[in-house]
Each structure stands twice: as C-alpha cells, then as structure tokens.
C-alpha cells in the first residue's frame, strides 16, 4: 500500500510538473500556426508581386518593340494604306475563293491557294508581331487574339483589316456561297429539315479571330469545333522557305454521329475511330476552309522537329450570332434542343 501511495504521489507531482510544459507547448503550437499562416500570406503576396513584375517587364518589352518597329515599318504602313484604299485585296480574295474547287471527301472543304495579292501577303507576314506579344503560358502553343490591345502599328492595323474587313466583306460572303449546298444539309442535321429555311436566313459573321503560333511538341487530337461554328477558316502564314509539313490533318470518322453538346467534340472519346485521310500542307498564302459537320481535323508537330520550327496561322469561325442562334434553338423540338444545351467538358486542351 505504501508503494501504491508513493506511485500516486509521484504521478501527481509529475502532472504538476508537466502542466506548465503542456501549456507552453499549446502556446507554441498556436504561435507556429500563426507563423505558418503569416508565411502563407507572405508567399501569396510575394507571388502576386512576382507576377506583377513579370507583367511589367513584358509590357516594357512590348513598348520598346512597338517604338522600334513603328519606325522600321513607316513605309510599309503607307503601302498598306494604299492597298486598303483601292480595294484590290478584297477583289483578289473573292476571285481566288470563287475559282477554287470544293472537295467533298471526307467532308466538304477547300484549300485556296494564292489567297492574297503577293504584295499584301508580304505585308501580312511583316505584320506578324514578335513573340512577346503572344500569350506566354505555353511556349508550344501561343495565341494572339484580335484586336490587339497594344502592339506595333503595322500589326494592329493589318490584323484589324484582316479581321474587320477581309474576313467580313470578302471571305465570309465568298465561302458562304461556295458552301451553300453543304450548309443546307448541315442545317437539316442540326435543326431539322423543317427549320432549314429559317437557319439559312440567319446572318452569319466571323468570330474568334486569333493569330496562332505553334512549335515542336504541339498535338491536337482529332476533333470538331464548337457547334455554333458552321465554317472554320485557317489562313496559313508560312514563309517562302518554310517546310510544308505539319499542316492541318483531315480525318474520316468511322461510326460518326452528331455531338450531343455544343462544346468541341472529340470522336475518339465517344468510341469512334479516326482515319487520317490527308494533311493539308502548310503553304504560303493559302487558306483551308471546312464545314464543321462530320469527320474531324487535328494537328501534330513532333517533339523532335527542328527547334527553330514555327507554324503561324490565323483562324476564325463563321456562324450565326449567339442571340439569333438561341432564338432558333428555343423553337426546336425538345430532343434537338437538348443537343444544344447539354454541356460536355473534355480533358483536351483547346486549339
């Protein structure tokens, strides 16, 4: 009994001894948690400052390049103004499209060669801004949306002319006429034969214009563009010495079907097999136009391609405006409406 009493006394003494230590440890833990929270906040603020500094450096570089190129391109801008004034570029584009054959295999598409007058194409090539003006998140896949917020005068004015005038006043009406019959079949598929005439009356306009820069390692799986796009136009801005390899891949799709959602559609994700039919060459002053109906298209530049290889293209869609399209979709039978409203996310990165 004496031994037990001694043990209990020792335990009580130990607890009294440890109590302040436990309190100290608890306080220490609180301080550590507070310090950890402060460090996280500090890291966040430092990260934000780092990002702002990077953006500031980027804008500074863009401003320096803009000033230098504005001086260099003074005479080129004068030549551009003369071409815009006489309207010769628009007439040339319309004629080139009208005289190009429409290919129906594996789906309606056409490749227009010598799309622009040579003198304008040279200006268009000169107007491609340096890399710092492109989005810098992914060096393999960089985009520059139009219109530009900041850039050399030649780049801003040429790309604005391409997007606002050439695409709208020359390319759009010419390709709409060329693809008139295939578009009627597409309207039947998307809206039903009873809504074909209504769909054919919808005003169509270019949208989503962007200058794209692609490098070795780039891969885009076979896909169809968002359903709202009736036609896709890809202008190849190759240099005279560029290899024609690694253009746009055209696929035939076995067991093809209409997408049941409006987003980009990847047939292989839905059990369909894609067969490569051909690769449209990356050729100077040419344009690929295709109906966004069946089949698929993609692109690939192998990682072991020359490190200096660059692929510049300008892409835009032609389709009805969102409000006009939504008004028509609201009138469709429920089973057709569902194919326009059901969202579908994909693991693939956008083009």
What is the predicted function of each stretch?
Residues 119, 128-136, 178-190, 194, ...:
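A generic secondary-structure signal for well-formed alpha-helical elements
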Residues 2-149, 339-351:
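N-terminal auxiliary "cap/dimerization" subdomain that precedes the catalytic jelly-roll/cupin core
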Residues 111-113, 210, 232, 289, ...:
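Short beta-strand segments
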Residues 147-209, 213, 225:
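Signature of the catalytic double-stranded beta-helix
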Residues 102, 106, 110-114, 161, ...:
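Short, charged/polar micro-motifs that form catalytic or ligand-binding hotspots
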Residues 3-45, 217, 224-229, 239, ...:
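Catalytic core of Fe(II)/2-oxoglutarate
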